[in-house]
């Protein structure tokens, strides 16, 4: 089957936003107008096409990123609808990794909200061009220009309107196009009858002012346009559009549009903007990767002629076809039934069938081309972030950064029958979601699951019950602490056992130093002259890694430590890998005496919105919870407080805030960083853990 749409006519976009800004409804409308669905499903009625899991329909939030394909103006648009709830950050992150552009949806009453900041920051990290859609213009309190100002104030984004609303709230009836300088007036409820008219007289001055601002902002990103602008020459609409496209693709400019997805206004114009301003796979730099045979960096330009290279970005268990692997093709062509190499794992995989997904319905296809997003059936060893390539042209593409889980729960099966099923269920769920970890406590035999927040674990336990029919008792949530060293030290690990027959002998000197936050564990071999033979070096590293899984103070995993093996000795007969593993773990224990070990706790960025009269209460809440206020701003009659607070102090805060503000206060929290716990708290944690052991 030949390629249906050329690469220039392909767009891979994500729809991202804060929870409840109307992302899924916006996606629904896109599918309606592009002819993918014939009846619109409302999220708040639990009938949305994209929210296809039972829990999503019950909770009215999007949990997994459903991928779908639509067509608009002779272009193919692959859309990924991502969740806005902070506990599902990995879904957003893995979508951004494989997208070329994104639509950020704002609630035009609230503007930029906490999770908008998180997804915006992630999109900036991945260099994803964005357009902004200020949604819910029909809502009471909708304020388009306020929303635009929050993009400047909270995100420091060079964002400018390319549209203005005509009316707002119940009176929202049309949109001014600042490029054509025309008004689009909606005359029916489905948003399909649109009249293009001259701009109403009462809006003309404002439209001219914002058109001028737009031209100036775009000219600042392009020298040729700047010269024309300064010399007073007219910049044509075509030049303006080309300038916006170039600056948007270079992530220097963010066009802002407005509308109401629920009231069917502005979505088609937003689709036009996706085509006009967001990049095709040809507009973005070629993907880079490492050739595993040479360790050299290589690129794969977006072209069907190049060797096949793709990134698996999501694993999903489908009740009808089994394990689905979603992947983005960066270069080359892939046919069903062919073999590929998973270069991340060094395993050969057979592509059974290839499916084009539409939320949770599917269409089987024979071939995928560069720039496509599809799902494959039949891959056994592939997990999130793995590279799939042509066997003759290996490359490992940059993987997906997986955030560390911050919260854990103990789960135990209710019956013997549940016990066997629980292991399989947890393994399948962990395959789908890399931020979900499953561990068994060696000493107690308990199963501990960790994730990004209470809702995250709640949904997974719920899925275990519904999809895998496993009943389990769940313990209270616990904080995932970490341990580290705060000082440098040198330590010896010496292990010798001789009791008849072959003995054991391992001797190492290791220098331990604190590493930068987030860098994890780094091992350096500085042995000179073979005092520790080469074949035992990996055993030393392995011994350290295994020991660091249970830290020296309270048994929490150790992070951000550098270890340099610089000296040691061995025995010709008695030295073995086991002996050197044990020696390394003894060196770590010895180092703990002088390396100032510390316990780290997850700090959350908490954003609390309360009526003005409750501001004093909230400041008291933050202080009482060992938090520190980072900033405050007024919004209407409310105050928004941003603060850093330890996760350990936030359990049950929803109830406290509700009673203090008579149910009018809300809060959101996002994991921000790890920080040393105060000495008094550290002693309590150690005591508690010793008591439990």
Swiss-Prot record:
UniProt cross-references to InterPro entries, sorted A to Z: EF-G-like_DII (IPR053905), EFG_II (IPR041095), EFG_III (IPR009022), EFG_III/V (IPR035647), EFG_IV (IPR047872), EFG_V (IPR035649), EFG_V-like (IPR000640), G_TR_CS (IPR031157)
The name this protein goes by in its record: Elongation factor G
Binding site for GTP: 17-24, 81-85, 135-138
Domain of life: Bacteria
Record gene name: fusA
MF terms (GO), sorted A to Z: GTP binding; GTPase activity; translation elongation factor activity
Biological-process GO terms, alphabetical: ribosome disassembly
Family indicated by similarity: Belongs to the TRAFAC class translation factor GTPase superfamily. Classic translation factor GTPase family. EF-G/EF-2 subfamily.
Stretches assigned to the tr-type G domain: 8-282
Gene Ontology CC, one term: cytoplasm
Gene source species: Streptococcus pneumoniae (strain ATCC 700669 / Spain 23F-1)
Its job: Catalyzes the GTP-dependent ribosomal translocation step during translation elongation. During this step, the ribosome changes from the pre-translocational (PRE) to the post-translocational (POST) state as the newly formed A-site-bound peptidyl-tRNA and P-site-bound deacylated tRNA move to the P and E sites, respectively. Catalyzes the coordinated movement of the two tRNA molecules, the mRNA and conformational changes in the ribosome.
Record flagged with keyword Phosphoprotein: no
Protein localization: Cytoplasm
Keywords: Cytoplasm, Elongation factor, GTP-binding, Nucleotide-binding, Protein biosynthesis
């Amino acid at each position: 089957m030949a390629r249906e749409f050329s690469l220039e006519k392909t767009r891979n976009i994500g729809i991202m936003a804060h929870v409840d800004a109307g992302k899924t409804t916006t996606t629904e409308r896109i599918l309606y107008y592009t002819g993918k669905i014939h009846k619109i499903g409302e999220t708040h009625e639990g009938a949305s096409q994209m929210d296809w899991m039972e829990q999503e329909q019950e909770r009215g939030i999007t949990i997994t990123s459903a991928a779908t394909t639509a067509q608009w103006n002779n272009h193919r648009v692959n859309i990924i609808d991502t969740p806005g709830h902070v506990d599902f950050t990995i879904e957003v992150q893995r979508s951004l990794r494989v997208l070329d552009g994104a639509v950020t949806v704002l609630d035009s009453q609230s503007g930029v909200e906490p999770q908008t900041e998180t997804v915006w920051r992630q999109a900036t990290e991945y260099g994803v061009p964005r357009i902004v859609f200020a949604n819910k213009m029909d809502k009471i309190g909708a304020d388009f220009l306020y929303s635009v100002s929050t993009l400047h104030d909270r995100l420091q984004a060079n964002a400018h309107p390319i549209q203005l609303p005509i009316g707002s709230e119940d009176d929202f009836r049309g949109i001014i196009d600042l490029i054509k300088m025309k008004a689009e007036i909606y005359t029916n409820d489905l948003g399909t009858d649109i009249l293009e008219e001259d701009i109403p007289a009462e809006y003309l001055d404002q439209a001219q002012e914002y058109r001028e601002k737009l031209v100036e902002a775009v000219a600042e990103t392009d020298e040729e346009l700047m010269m024309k602008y300064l010399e007073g020459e007219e910049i044509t609409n075509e030049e303006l559009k080309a300038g916006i496209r170039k600056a948007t693709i270079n992530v220097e400019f963010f066009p802002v549009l407005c509308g109401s997805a629920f009231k069917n206004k502005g979505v088609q114009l937003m689709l036009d903007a996706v085509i006009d301003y967001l990049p095709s796979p040809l507009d973005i730099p070629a993907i880079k990767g490492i050739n595993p045979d040479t360790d050299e960096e290589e690129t794969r330009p977006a072209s069907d002629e190049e060797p096949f290279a793709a990134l698996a970005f999501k694993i999903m268990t489908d009740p009808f076809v089994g394990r689905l692997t979603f992947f983005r093709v960066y270069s080359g062509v892939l046919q069903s039934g062919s073999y590929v190499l998973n270069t991340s794992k060094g395993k050969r995989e057979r592509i059974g069938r290839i499916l084009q997904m539409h939320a949770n319905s599917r269409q089987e296809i024979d071939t995928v081309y560069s720039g496509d997003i599809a799902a494959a059936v039949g891959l056994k060893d592939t997990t999130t972030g793995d590279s799939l390539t042509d066997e003759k042209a290996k490359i490992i593409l940059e993987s997906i950064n997986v955030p560390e889980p911050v919260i854990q729960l103990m789960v135990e099966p209710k019956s013997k029958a549940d016990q066997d099923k629980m292991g399989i269920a947890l393994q399948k769920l962990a395959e789908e979601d890399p931020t979900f970890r499953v561990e068994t406590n060696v000493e107690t035999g308990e199963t501990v699951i960790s994730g990004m927040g209470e809702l995250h674990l709640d949904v997974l336990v719920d899925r275990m019950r519904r999809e895998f029919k496993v009943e389990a008792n769940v313990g209270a949530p616990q904080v995932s602490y970490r341990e580290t060293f705060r000082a440098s030290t040198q330590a010896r690990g010496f292990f010798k056992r001789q009791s008849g027959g072959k003995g054991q002998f391992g001797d190492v000197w290791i220098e331990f130093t604190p590493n930068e936050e987030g860098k994890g564990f780094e091992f350096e071999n500085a042995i000179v002259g073979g005092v520790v033979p080469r074949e035992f070096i990996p055993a030393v590293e392995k011994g350290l890694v295994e020991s660091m899984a249970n830290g020296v103070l309270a048994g929490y995993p150790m992070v951000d430590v550098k270890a340099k093996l610089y000296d040691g000795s061995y025995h010709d007969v008695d030295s073995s890998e086991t002996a050197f593993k044990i020696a390394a773990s003894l060196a770590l224990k010895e180092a703990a005496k002088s390396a100032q070990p510390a316990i780290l706790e997850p700090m959350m960025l908490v954003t609390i919105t309360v009526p003005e009269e409750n501001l004093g209460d909230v400041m008291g809440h933050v202080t009482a919870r060992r938090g520190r206020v980072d900033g405050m701003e007024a919004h209407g009659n409310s105050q928004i407080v941003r603060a850093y607070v330890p996760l350990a102090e936030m359990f049950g805060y929803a109830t406290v805030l509700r009673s203090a503000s008579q149910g009018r206060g809300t809060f959101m929290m996002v994991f921000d960083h790890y920080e040393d716990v105060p000495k008094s708290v550290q002693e309590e944690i150690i005591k508690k853990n010793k008591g439990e052991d």
